[in-house]
Amino acid sequence: AANSIINHNKNKIDKLVWTSNTDGSKIKVQRCSTDADEGREVASTIFEIKMHEQRLNNEFAVLYRTNAQSRAIEDALRKRDISYRVYGGLSFYQRKEIKDLLAYLRLIVNPSDEESLKRIINYPARGIGQSTLDKLIIGAKKNDISLFDTIKNSSKLNLSLNRGVLSKLLDFSNFILSLQIENQKSNAFEIADLVTKKTGLVLELKKDGTPEGVSKVENVEELLNGIHDFVEGQKEISDSEINAILKKM
């Protein structure tokens, strides 16, 4: 089957692909309208074979060409409660660029999420370094308030920070607060799209012109596609929309 497909490539390098296995069943080609449909088709096929033939998960393999393609497949497998392992790379939601965008969304719905806050307070770079963060953490503990509240009130607290840094902290807290307000009237896709544009997250990734850099941009775009698909499936805008998406991921 592989050889017959390769033969259609006019620019191919001559090679013969072979296996010592016996002949298997013919390849089935299934056309899907969207990546979500493709993911559902893959997961449904695996689920049906598992049920009818009592197969184990490790008897199946899914091959895809680009990292971004794994998002729809992973989502569909999770919905079917089919456990999986990604070889030769990371799971879609374990990739740094995906974690960064999701951290912004988590912080919007929960300002007390300190891990997310620490992750993105200086990404993309906004001049808030580790020494500043250390002082903020100490200040939060000393005043028995959250890290975000410490940032929000940093100009009123004795944190030994210069005016330049205090100004950057105020800009950051105001930015997150504005997103929280926007979240009350916009859907999750609009918020996620706004975050990527306002932070310059995609522009930062585009600075890396390598194939890996291009792949990271595609991953972020695919995450936005996934959020858009989720929103389209909802009947009305809800302020818990982002929470629902984060739970799904």
Language-model features: locations:
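Conserved RecA-like helicase motor-core motifs
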Residues: 81-91
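Conserved short loop/turn motifs at secondary-structure junctions
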Residues: 60-65, 90, 122-123, 209-212
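A generic fold-level signal
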Residues: 22-24, 55-57, 96, 196, ...
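Helicase P-loop NTPase motor core
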Residues: 1-83, 106-110, 166
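Conserved helicase C-terminal RecA-like lobe
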Residues: 70-82, 95, 102-249
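Residue-level recognition of hydrophobic positions within alpha-helical transmembrane segments
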Residues: 34, 93-96
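Short, flexible active-site loop motifs that bind/organize anionic cofactors or intermediates
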Residues: 28-32, 88, 123
